[in-house]
Structures are given as structure tokens and as C-alpha cells.
Amino acid sequence: MPSFDIVSEVDLQEVDNAVNQTVKEITTRYDFKGSKSTLTREDAVITILADDAYKLEQVTEVLKGKMVRRSVDPHFLDFGTVEPASGAMVRQNVTVKQGIESEFAKKIVKTIKNAKLKVQAAIQGDQVRVTGKKRDDLQEAIALLKSQSFEQPLQFNNFRD
């Protein structure tokens, strides 16, 4: 039976490139002269350190722009709360979302089942597998999910006949 997987993955190398480009732009921008603003990435967490809330907002806007240029959807970024840091600075942790959480997977399965398509959707860890008897049914399911606006971007891979 034909099947495909619904995943939500981001290329961390592209995220790293976007972070490096953001750091480079911050060091050369005139409005950041004398600023101690920094950006660091460890695994799936980007830490933004800035002088004040305004500069923090500027850094996040630059980061989002660089993400878009690197073909990384900004919806992958989960911005945490702004917290005070040492030396009258502010810090914000940005988590890069990887995989589909169980609540979001249930929402995807429910959307497919409510559409009354001739496919079955099953949650498998951090992905959703959709199987059907015909390839056309699977393509209808992909079209349905692309037409929906979810809070997290989806990719469709592992399409098998």
C-alpha cells in the first residue's frame, strides 16, 4: 500500500549559517556600535544577549530575515521570554523546533480524518505516517494539509508505492 510520512524538520546547518550571518551583520551595523549584543547557538537553542529590549528586538528581526534568506521557515523558531541578564543586559532563548509533538500530531490526524479521505493516519514518534490504497488519495491528503495553516511547517517525505 502506498504511504508517506509527514515530518517537521529543519536543517541545523542552515540555522547555523543564519546565526553566523546575523552575528556578522550585528558587528558591522552602525546602530550596534559599542553594543555587547551577541548570538550563540548550542544544539537546538539560540541564545540572544542584548543591551536592552529594543536592541533585542532588532537582533530577532535580523535573525528572522537571515532565516528566510537561508530558506528556513521562521515558524521553526520558538521565542522564549525576555529575562534580565548580568550587567543590565537582557537575554532571550530561542528554541528551534524539531519533529512533531504529540498534540500537534493528533491535530494533523484529526484534520485528515475529518476530511473523510480514504487514507489512514498513524502517529509514529515525531512523525505521522499516512497510508492509502491509491496514490491519488495520498496526493489529496497532501493537498489538504498544504491548504491548512498550521503553526509549524510540514514536509512530506518517504513517499512509497
Curated annotation (Swiss-Prot):
* One annotated Gene Ontology cellular component of this protein: cytosol
Cite a single Pfam family from the UniProt record. Answer: DUF520
Gene3D superfamilies, alphabetically?
3.30.70.860, YajQ-like, domain 2
GO MF, any single term: nucleotide binding
Report which superkingdom the organism of origin falls in: Bacteria
Keywords, comma-separated and alphabetical: Nucleotide-binding
Q: Which InterPro entries match?
A: DUF520, UPF0234-like_C, UPF0234_N, YajQ-like_sf
Summarize the protein's role: Nucleotide-binding protein.
Which protein family is it in?
Answer: Belongs to the YajQ family.
- What protein am I looking at? Nucleotide-binding protein Mmc1_1670
Which organism encodes this protein?
Answer: Magnetococcus marinus (strain ATCC BAA-1437 / JCM 17883 / MC-1)
